[in-house]
């Protein structure tokens, strides 16, 4: 190694050491001035020898050119959300569900952490070097924020220590301490810039800057709390031990992580954190409780978009008092009439609130609410403002009754309320402009047909100008017609037309979700698509046949049956197909008809695969007649163990289940 290379390596190592002591251990051993001197020396040497600059150098946190837009990154392992509980009774019910699923009455060890009020991000390290960072996005696809994350000084550009995996994706929260938030807003007021409502918004705005030099000026910080991709290495068998390993590698971890061995200890931890909340120096909105054992986590598995082994125990939402100035009625996608209180604006949990949902007529009656009342407002889950109660002692003499409409406020169609349902609905269907707008917005949304560039304002204009009445009309739009909309130039119009053309190629599950059938969300749409295979089979299914689909009960089955029984809905579907909306035809072959070593077997994949992605491997196995399961049990016939296989492999060996490696799988697949 040349002397200059040796000098650069030593400087970088020294600076990383001091960054680790300062940001992770909170124990700096040199004054800031000495750190700054070392950094200046490194910058000087790198400017003289630019060919020796490395991407993990401490100088490379700042300096990338501004972006014109964020590119998308698909998460190799989905970033799931957590289910919430809001009181001790609900947490104890969660604990009971976990015990019941494990068929055990023994106390569990939980790893308890702060629920930070920031932005969830994933950071990918390859051979210890930071290579990529992304936002959570919709859990499947996020935005590439690598350049911005590199500017956050608490996040190491290079991990240090031994046994670092070849590929390690850590998940965590980027947030803004309250002191930094106040400093940003103080500067914004002084210069006439944007003043943020709360630290979370400020963190989001800082992290999503197209110019990373702006992000670098914001005092963002980070705590890691989990792992996504893991290849070419091993991690400890408990969540808490993994966090300690992360810390040893230089990643920042909250010092409030605590192991609790009984439900009572969890509740004590929750109360203590709630008591300390005002003094932490950063915003949290609860605590996260996770089963500590990775083996038990795998056994518990997931439901829909959340794990069964973890829950967010949210703090009671912050409350304020204000006055109801009026009550208006909004019409949703399925015709639901929702009363909305128009409030005297008031700050609640750092957000200026001027509207609050009243849910339905029963809720108004329960509250005894009148227009003009003084009310208590709560941000439920710190997100959706709600009216909690009426301050009857301060009711003004001129308070007015809330009169629920008998006709739709948008299209004047009759409003009906089905017996047994709390929600009143407009009967206008797609002749109702409000329902039409919301249905179309749902149809083009990211998780449905995902029409890039077609936002809410475009849909509003298309409906108001009567260019579009049904989803099929969207595919008949021309660039010329779109150019007539506000703020829509020829290039933007053509981009929307191109996006519509691209959206015609979809999946059966996305198509079903896009149709907006009542009570049919993404998971149910996927289950229906997998069970019936074709649109024709689903359209002809009886209520009884629909209930044979996993997790489909009488309510969902009835809504689905009624949707396809409605002639106007069938007409819209026919028009969509005529416009070219399509998806791959399923290949359905009975397992007993397949000549394959996997036919009819229940197979579990574990560990990392090098020759196929996990999704590809699953698809190949299913095509050969296998049923691919997520966990090992006595019903498992075969376990395929890739690199760094963990507790699933151990359980398979314990149960005496046949185990093969990836090479043998590829041989049996015919590769």
Curated annotation (Swiss-Prot):
Name the residues annotated as catalytic in the UniProt entry. 115
Q: What is this protein called?
A: DNA ligase
Q: Which UniProt keywords apply?
A: DNA damage, DNA repair, DNA replication, Ligase, Magnesium, Manganese, Metal-binding, NAD, Zinc
The UniProt catalytic activity note for this protein reads:
NAD(+) + (deoxyribonucleotide)n-3'-hydroxyl + 5'-phospho-(deoxyribonucleotide)m = (deoxyribonucleotide)n+m + AMP + beta-nicotinamide D-nucleotide
Quote the EC number: 6.5.1.2
The protein's role, per its UniProt record: DNA ligase that catalyzes the formation of phosphodiester linkages between 5'-phosphoryl and 3'-hydroxyl groups in double-stranded DNA using NAD as a coenzyme and as the energy source for the reaction. It is essential for DNA replication and repair of damaged DNA.
Annotated Zn(2+) binding lies at 408, 411, 426, 432
Required cofactor(s): Mg(2+); Mn(2+)
- PANTHER family in the cross-refs: CHROMOSOME TRANSMISSION FIDELITY FACTOR 18 (PTHR23389), DNA LIGASE (PTHR23389:SF9)
NCBIfam families the UniProt entry points to: dnlj, PRK07956.1
Q: Which residues form a coiled coil?
A: none
């Amino acid at each position: 190694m040349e002397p200059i290379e040796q000098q650069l390596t030593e400087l970088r190592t020294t600076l990383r050491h001091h960054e680790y002591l300062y940001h992770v251990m909170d124990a700096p051993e040199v004054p800031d001035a000495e750190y700054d001197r070392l950094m200046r020396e490194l910058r000087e040497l790198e400017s003289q020898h630019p060919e020796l600059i490395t991407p993990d150098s401490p100088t490379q946190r700042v300096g990338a050119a501004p972006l014109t837009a964020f590119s998308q990154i698909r998460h190799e392992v989905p970033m799931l959300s957590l289910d919430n509980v809001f009181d001790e009774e609900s947490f104890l019910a969660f604990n009971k569900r976990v015990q019941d699923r494990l068929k055990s009455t023994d106390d569990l060890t939980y790893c308890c952490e702060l629920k930070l009020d920031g932005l969830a991000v994933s950071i990918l390290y390859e051979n210890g070097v930071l290579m990529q960072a992304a936002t959570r996005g919709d859990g499947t696809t996020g935005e590439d924020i690598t350049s911005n994350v590199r500017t956050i000084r608490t996040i190491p550009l290079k991990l240090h220590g031994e046994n670092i995996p070849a590929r390690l994706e850590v998940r965590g929260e980027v947030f803004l301490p309250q002191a930094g938030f106040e400093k940003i807003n103080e500067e914004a007021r002084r210069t006439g810039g944007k003043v943020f409502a709360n630290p979370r918004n400020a963190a989001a705005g800082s992290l999503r800057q197209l110019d990373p030099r702006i992000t670098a000026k914001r005092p963002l910080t980070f705590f890691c709390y989990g792992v996504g991709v893991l290849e070419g290495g091993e991690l400890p068998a408990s969540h808490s031990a993994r966090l300690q390993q992360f810390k040893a590698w230089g990643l920042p971890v909250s010092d409030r992580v605590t192991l609790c061995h009984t439900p009572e200890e969890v509740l004590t931890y929750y109360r203590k954190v709630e008591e300390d909340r005002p003094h932490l120096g950063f915003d949290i909105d609860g605590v996260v409780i996770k089963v500590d054992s990775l083996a038990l986590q795998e056994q518990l598995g997931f439901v829909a978009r959340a794990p069964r082994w973890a829950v967010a125990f949210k703090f009671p939402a912050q409350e304020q008092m204000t006055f109801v100035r009026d009550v208006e009625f909004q019409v949703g996608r399925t015709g639901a009439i929702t009363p909305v209180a128009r409030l005297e604006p008031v700050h609640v949990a750092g957000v200026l609130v001027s509207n609050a949902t009243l849910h339905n007529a029963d809720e108004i009656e329960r509250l005894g609410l009148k227009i003009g009342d003084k009310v208590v407002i709560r941000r439920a889950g710190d997100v959706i403002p709600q009216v909690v109660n009426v301050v009857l002692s301060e009711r003004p003499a001129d308070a007015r009754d809330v009169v629920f409409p008998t006709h739709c406020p948008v299209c004047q169609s009759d409003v009906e309320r089905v017996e047994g349902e709390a929600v009143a609905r407009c009967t206008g269907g797609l002749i109702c402009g409000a329902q039409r707008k919301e249905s179309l917005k749902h149809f083009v949304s990211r998780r449905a047909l995902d029409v890039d560039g077609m936002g809410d304002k475009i849909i509003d204009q298309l409906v108001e100008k009567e260019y579009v009445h049904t989803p099929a009309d969207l595919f008949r739009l021309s660039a010329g017609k779109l150019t007539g909309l506000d703020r829509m130039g020829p290039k933007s119009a053509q981009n929307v037309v191109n996006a519509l053309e691209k959206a015609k190629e979809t999946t059966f599950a996305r198509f079903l979700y896009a149709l907006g059938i009542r009570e049919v969300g993404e998971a149910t749409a996927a289950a229906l698509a997998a069970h019936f295979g074709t649109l024709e089979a689903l359209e002809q299914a009886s209520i009884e046949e629909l209930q044979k689909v996993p997790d489909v009960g009488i309510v969902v089955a009835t809504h689905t049956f009624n949707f396809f029984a409605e002639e106007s809905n069938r007409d819209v579907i026919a028009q969509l197909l005529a416009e070219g909306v399509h998806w791959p035809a399923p290949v359905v072959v009975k397992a007993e008809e397949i000549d394959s070593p996997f036919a009819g077997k229940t197979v579990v994949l574990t560990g990392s695969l090098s020759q196929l992605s996990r999704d590809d491997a699953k698809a190949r196995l299913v095509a050969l007649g296998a049923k691919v399961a997520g966990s090992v049990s006595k019903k498992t016939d075969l376990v395929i163990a890739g690199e760094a296989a963990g507790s699933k492999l151990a359980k398979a060996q314990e149960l005496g289940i046949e185990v093969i490696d990836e090479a043998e799988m590829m041989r049996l697949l015919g590769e």
